[in-house]
Amino acid sequence: NDEVPPRRAYLEDFIAPTYNVKFIFSETLKDDAATKTFIENCIDSGVDAIIDMKSASGQMAQLCMDNGLVYTINGNYTQHPELLTTDYTNFAGCIGANNAQVGSLFGDWLEENASEDGSEGFLISTSLAAQGNTQHVEITRAILEGLQQKYGITYTKSIDDLIASSETTNVENDKNILITLYPGSPNKDTWLPGVSALIQTGQYNTFLSAGQTYNQSATVVDEVEKSFGINIKVASVGALGTTLETAFNTKDSSGNSSVDLVAIKTVSTQTAAMFAATYNALVSGAECRACRGEDGLPVYFTFNFIPITSAEQLTEMSGWDAKETGNWIANKDFVDQMLVTVNPDVTSDDINAIMQSLSYEKIKEMMG
């Protein structure tokens, strides 16, 4: 996806020479067995740490601990509770999205952009929320709560039960507002035909997604807009890159962008947090206060998403976190403040405060 090239460039072209470290990158890993094989090969190559973007499990943490490697993951503890309940002394922590903040972006957008009576119809792609994906759960929850607050509606079922449904669900409510939940991964072959069939009814003028779907759904959305003479508002998550640029700069039949809100992660800041946790564990041990909370447990380091709502805003961000420009949001000053070698008194709370302080306005100021 669009995150991979800039993440690798950030590590290879900026982090490696700046902090005198080296990286070995895997090919695409299809399962845990492939991850295990890659880690074993890295052990044979003499690496000091593993940053796991794929499997993130106690099995991998144990393998690393048995061989003296620091282990850091991209993910969350909801899906991998053993990383909190088992004493992996080499485990540097978990880096993931500030899910409540991501969800609030969707809630705020709905408050500003949904109609006064809710007559447009809302189709919500819940992605992997039913399987427990924390980010997808929080976004779906924020959307349902946002609709509830805006229209003063009461759902027949609890929001938790609605989120947990693995079937297409029309959300019963006392105002009879059309709200439909469509679960499933957009990477599955069955996702697009299913969501297309719903959009083609012409009943939904707002399409919200807990995952990145605007690239898959753009064609059918445009076709339905032409057929019914409507403008379907689209809100999703995504990442800086050509896919996002195409989405905002592609106009539908009414002259509107094919997407209205995309909540993006800034790849360099996420990657900087993973590097900082790993580097601090290598220098001071994974049980240092830069990697552990006051309770002595591993920390969930979080990063904020940034809301993009126009092609003009995206133009202002041109060149940010781009391999071609090397103009990284998480520059040396930003990374240094999270490292024990530069800031010996830094704690895990300090690092989280640094990460959570980032907003579009703050980043714009940082980038000059």
Q: What is each PLM-predicted segment?
A:
Residues 1-368:
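A residue-level marker of the well-folded mature domains of exported/periplasmic proteins
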